[in-house]
Amino acid sequence: GNISVVGANEWVSESQVLDIAGQQAGKSILLVSNNDVEKKIKEIPGVTSAQSKKKLPDSLEVTIKAQKPAAMLKTGEDSMTAVDSKGRILNSVSGASVEGIPVIEVKDVETSLSNRSIKEALKILSSLPESMRNSITKVTAETQDSITTEINGGDRVIVWGDSSGLKLKKAVVDKIINDPNVIGDKHNVDVSAPLRPIIK
C-alpha cells in the first residue's frame, strides 16, 4: 500500500512517521486501525497531533502537526540537545536551524528532564510567541516556581514563576513590556503572581 505523510518538519522527519505507520499497517492497509497509528505517531517527540485516514483501495494518509523544539538543553561547550514541550528528546534532522530556540544550560540532559523545574520551563517556553522566543538570551530554572527568561541580553528579565495561569501571565507581561509608561526604565517584571505583578 501507499503511505503518505503531511506536515513533517525539520525536527520530525517523514521517514520516522513512515516507519511507524508502516509497522502498524503491516501487510494490509484495510485492516489497519487509524487509532493505533495515531497513538503510535503521537509518541514521536515533537509531534503534537496525528491524524490517520484510509484512502481506498490501499493508501493511508497521515497528517501530523510537528512543533519546533521547546528548548535546546546545553551541556558543556558545544553539546545541544533539542527537547519538545513534553521533555522528549528530538532527533534533529540534519541542517535543522537552532536559531530562535531558547537555550537552557543544564549539567546533564537525562537528569534535567526528570526535574520539575525544567519541565515547567519547557511548558512556559513552548507557549511563548515566536517573537519573544526569538529574543530570549537566557533561561534559568533554579526551582520549579522561579522560571525566568532573559530577553535581549538582560534588557528585560521576566520571572514567570511556574507554568500555572500562563495565559494571564503572558497577557500581563505583554501589557507591561509594551507600554513605556508602565515599564519606564525598569528591566525586571515578575508575574509569578500575575494579579500583582512586580516591576523593578
Regions from the PLM with identified roles:
Residues 61-136:
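Extracytoplasmic segments of membrane-associated envelope/inner-membrane machinery
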Residues 1, 13, 33, 37, ...:
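Envelope-exposed proteins and targeting segments
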Residues 1-11, 28-79, 83, 119-123:
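Periplasmic polypeptide-binding modules associated with outer-membrane biogenesis and secretion
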Residues 6-45, 98, 102-116, 179:
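Periplasmic/extracytosolic POTRA-like scaffold domains at the N-termini of outer-membrane
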